Amino acid sequence: MRIETTILGNLLLNEEYTRKVLPFLKNDYFTSNAEKTIHETIGDFVTKYNSLPTKEALSIELQEVKINEEEFKETMELLDDISKDTEEYADLGWLLDSTEKFCQDKAIYNAVVESIGILDNQKSSQDKGLIPE
């Protein structure tokens, strides 16, 4: 099981975990579009209703997301996998530590990729002076 799956599954099941980590999880940290869609939809639901979505509620919300049919199918398959794989709570301390490390690693990775893009002039709106020494 990947840490992304564990994170998303616990966002659905563990309210204490969700309230602690959701403000720090960015969509950019997730690799697949399905993971990004589920993360964003959970975040929107929690913001709107101040509670965790059930699998059924999330499924209904996902039907409203503007994605193509193939992405929708992948997203629903991932949701099913997450629901099956995350049937019990993991230790909160371990979850928080693992999620913090995941966020740090992804933030560093994204910064390196963006810096390479700036150096390669792929992003002409960014100045090379933005890269820290």
What are these regions (language model features)?
Residues 1-102:
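Noncatalytic partner-interaction/assembly domains of nucleic-acid and motor enzyme complexes
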Residues 83-133:
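Interdomain "pre-motor" coupling segment immediately N-terminal to P-loop NTPase/helicase cores
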